[in-house]
Curated annotation (Swiss-Prot):
Keyword annotations from UniProtKB, A to Z: Cytoplasm, DNA damage, DNA excision, DNA repair, Excision nuclease, SOS response
Localization terms from the record: Cytoplasm
Organism in which the protein naturally occurs: Rickettsia akari (strain Hartford)
Record's protein name: UvrABC system protein C
Domain GIY-YIG: residue ranges: 20-97
One GO molecular-function entry: DNA binding
Pfam families (alphabetical): GIY-YIG, HHH_5, UVR, UvrC_RNaseH, UvrC_RNaseH_dom
Coarse class of the protein's main subcellular location: cytoplasm
GO cellular component term, pick one: cytoplasm
Coiled-coil region(s): none
A biological process from GO: SOS response
């Protein structure tokens, strides 16, 4: 019996009991990984579709990979939509249309739980301690707006701990970006007036704001308070300048314009944000697994996934019809706990013109993406031929480590896929926190065997994405130059994880190293009984970039012409891993230095160290503090404060 018949029989067996009701079904592969999630108004009718003979290639591949099938009945189509969206978000099935870059947009937040509210950049759910304005399409746009606001209104941006510890104005006051409320340079009433002006500006009430400021300027002038009047005049000028630079719309107040475009089977969905009559930027998305999909399907999947994480405006403007729009609206409203939402496709007028322009920009974004995609695919074909791979690599992992004479050691994995570097898949290994007893070679897969003899790494199945806070917490240092042991530990931990995540197995591993590293990789691969292709890339005898050597099992060492595009590409991969390793090593080292500087002061134990950091808010603030400021911390007397000051200022 063929594979296709077997899979078809599996679906037929499920059809016997499948009800003619709405619900969600899930397909699993041989490893019990969810490979597809779908919804249906009628489960029996929908599953019958998969035993037809005229299926497209993507659906045939999906069915060929299906070993198990489950379905869940829902009370309504809206509930089915919601469940489907939740399962797609949770499992990220490879045959579903996926929105890979789902990070939340940044906001400008005005904290209102303090006598002198703070203005800051913010990501995440809206909290009760302030008011959020936005969203903005990028952190750059938020930072630019914050800088302009600080120049115009001079509200504080510092943390509460820093604010409470000040006895004199900081640099922000000196460069005229803060009124220094921390030391009483402005009273609460005047500061609250500035806060109200910031709210007006961010809510788009700029005309009314400028009128109020003009009246205030005239009042101050009539009272002979010319310096204050001049300051208001400068604020009005600055507001006018910011308005000229910003894209103000008199057509759309609060809306997202979302357009979908297609070229050569690839799709781009671009989102244009409008809030308070102003354009807040745009960002393109390139959904995956869109083969044999329609614009309707891509847009539907995008909307459900996008609005699970992003703030929903009063109106969503799209350029293409979607199926069952009313149920989509109800699903998005339930996800975000809102009562009003409108999804429209404008036919004529100003909104239609905005949509047309948005589609033109989206098509340009897609063309730029395709250029990069095609170039990347060409390089992947060359890599397949160069290293004798059986298929075009879809996922390449590059390994490197960084340390100083064995101290503060970190290992990293950098991942590159079809569309370039996939930074969400980057991983950092805090090698310093692992006991050297891992080199006892007790590998295979049970956690107990993996750490035989180890007393410090109590749970080797912990995620390999080590939190950066953990990177410098240990005392273990490696023997000088012991790169082999570091690589061994990284591979043990990585392959242990990959055993449990077979869908993330790389097509190729590239290790920054030479012949000795090659032996370590082969040894660990054999112990794990895994057969992932790998190659070691070294800088040659004199360690010079440009004469790289490649080491592979069963092959002679070889080099490539430095002018070849594939050579330059491999150097870019190696350099990305190298830079990522150095960045994380320096981060850990700087934390260790900061903590040890306080640890080395006689009379400063763990309790006093915590008290100092809690009072001042950061290590830098402790360093900036005067002796008098240090004495305000509980447990720090005058003589100890002087010792802390002298020690920190010797560095």
């Amino acid at each position: 019996m063929t594979l296709e018949i077997t899979r078809s029989e599996l679906i037929k067996s499920k059809l016997i009991d499948a009800p003619e009701r709405c619900g969600v079904y899930r397909m699993f592969d041989v490893n019990k990984q969810v490979i597809y999630v779908g919804k249906a108004k009628n489960l029996k009718k929908r599953l019958t579709h998969y035993i037809k003979s005229d299926l497209d290639n993507k659906t045939l591949r999906m069915i060929a990979n299906t070993c198990f099938l489950e379905y869940s009945i829902t009370n309504s189509e809206v509930e089915a939509l919601l469940l489907e969206a939740q399962l797609i978000k949770k499992f990220q099935p490879k045959f579903n249309i996926l929105l890979k870059d789902d990070k939340s947009f940044p906001f400008i937040k005005l904290r209102l739980d303090h006598d002198f509210p703070q203005l800051l950049k913010y990501r995440g759910k809206t909290l009760n301690d302030g008011k959020c304005f936005g969203p903005f399409a990028s952190a750059t746009e938020v930072n630019t707006t914050l800088t302009e606001l600080q120049k115009i209104f001079k509200l504080r941006s510092c943390t509460d701990n820093y604010f409470n510890s000040r006895t004199r104005p900081c640099m922000q006051y000196e460069i005229k970006r803060c009124y220094a409320p921390c030391v009483g340079k402005i009273n609460k009433e005047d500061y609250r007036d500035l806060v109200a002006q910031v709210k007006d500006f961010l809510q788009g009430r700029t005309k009314a704001l400028q009128e109020n400021l003009s009246k205030k300027m005239e009042e101050l002038s009539s009272q002979m308070r010319f310096e204050e009047a001049a300051e208001i005049r400068d604020r009005i000028k600055a507001l006018s300048y910011v308005q000229l630079k910003s894209c103000v719309s008199d057509i759309v107040k609060d809306a997202d314009i979302i357009v979908v475009v297609e070229k050569n089977g690839h799709y781009c969905v671009e989102v244009f944000l409008y809030r308070a009559w102003q354009a807040c930027g745009n960002i393109p998305y390139f959904p995956t697994s869109t083969e044999n999909s329609t614009k309707e399907e891509v847009l539907e999947y995008f909307l459900l996934q996008f609005y699970q994480k992003q703030q929903v405006p009063a109106e969503i403007i799209i350029n293409h019809e979607i199926n069952d729009k009313e149920n989509m609206i109800e699903a998005i409203k339930k996800i975000n706990n809102i009562t009003k939402l409108n999804i429209i496709i404008p036919i004529s007028g100003g909104k239609a013109k905005l949509v047309q322009n948005a589609a033109i920009k989206a098509l340009f974004s897609l063309e730029q993406y395709l250029k990069k995609f095609v170039k990347n695919q060409e390089i992947m074909l060359e890599i397949k031929a160069l290293f004798g791979l059986h298929e075009i690599p879809e996922r390449i992992e590059i390994y490197d480590n960084s340390h100083i004479q064995g101290k503060f050691a970190v290992g990293v994995v950098v991942v590159v896929g079809k569309a370039g570097f996939d930074k969400k898949e980057y991983r950092v290994f805090s090698l310093s926190s692992c006991d050297a007893s891992l080199s006892s070679h007790a590998y295979p897969f049970s956690p107990r065997n993996l750490i035989a003899g180890s007393s410090t790494l109590t749970n080797p199945m912990d995620p390999v994405v080590r939190s950066r806070e953990d990177d410098t917490s240990s005392t273990h240092n490696y023997a000088v130059g012991d790169d082999y042991e570091m690589l061994r530990q990284v591979l043990i931990r990585r392959l242990t994880r990959l055993k449990n995540e077979p869908h993330k197995l790389p097509s190729l591993m590239i290790i920054d190293g030479g012949k000795g590293h090659l032996g370590i990789v082969k040894e660990v691969m054999d112990k794990f009984a895994m057969h992932i292709p790998f190659v070691c890339m070294s800088k040659g005898v004199d360690r010079n970039a440009g004469i790289e050597q490649f080491h592979m099992t069963g092959k002679e060492v070889f080099t490539l012409d430095t002018n070849l595009p594939i050579m330059k590409y491999l150097q870019i991969l190696r350099d990305e891993a190298h830079n990522f390793a150095i960045k994380n090593h320096r981060l850990g080292r700087s934390r260790a230095i900061k903590i040890s500087s306080l640890d080395n002061i006689e009379g400063v134990g763990e309790t006093r160290k915590k008290a100092l950091l809690h009072y001042f808010g950061s290590y830098k603030a402790v360093c900036d503090a005067t002796i008098d400021e240090l004495t305000k911390v509980n447990g720090i007397n005058k003589s100890l404060a002087a010792m802390i000051f002298r020690t920190l200022h010797k560095r």
